[in-house]
Amino acid sequence: MTSCQFSSVEASGSGTVKTLMSDLPKDPRYQFTYRVAEFLNDALYDRYQHDDGTLFRRLMSYHETLSESEEISFVPFCGNHVEILNVDIPEPCVVNYGEEFMNESFYEIDGEKAVAAEAIQIFESFLDLFPLEIADGRGFIESDFRYMKDRRIPVIMGSEYKELFETGDIFEGYYLFERVSFEVIGIAKSGNTFYHPAVGPALYDRYIIMPFERVTNDSPFSRLQLLQETCGFIISENGWETAVSQIQQSLTDSGLADWRDQIVVNTRTIR
């Protein structure tokens, strides 16, 4: 399964900072926006990871079918953390910040100091729904979303990182169990808000913002990444039933009918 979850939280925050629903941008689409998450059981997940590539191709077909729907708009999102190596990051950016088990986010990987850092993975459509202003550097461009093996992953750093990183800086870490290099292309302005399915409204400030890179060739990494992309948001002006129907029909049409009860649409909108 992916790390995507639902939460009934209406507000979230750390320290004295509290982010409320009212801090989200004023977008009428929010009243039609539902959260989507993947809950593959162990048997289906194991089959997906270890088959001959048939399920990977079917899942690609599902995404293509869903993107062509005229009834809904699907906005992929996931919140997998990044394991940063040999860098002391700001405390608010650490996974489990403010919790009694925050110390579990610090460890070693093959003898190197590592820390679990908050991160999100998105497409352009997410930034259309939850805009992000850039203080320094640039935002994402189309080529940032193309998967290129062994290239540095372009990232935008939340404003908490502004004293630590500059545009052009490179750092090492692990993402989806692979060691990768990250290149800072921008630093975000402070105070921009988005909706995190697992925690509710949140500030971009403490997150590493990563592009979902569009995968086409089957590989262990591609399978994990494509599965992450089943999570996110559905905008359905015709209501929850239409959102569910579109997902289930797309799964059936793509040969994934046995996943129909594993991709879940929350009954509540985010607004």
Language-model features: locations:
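Membrane-proximal extracellular/periplasmic loop immediately following the first transmembrane helix
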Residues: 9-123
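Hydrophobic secondary-structure segments that place a key small or acidic residue at a functional site
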Residues: 111-208
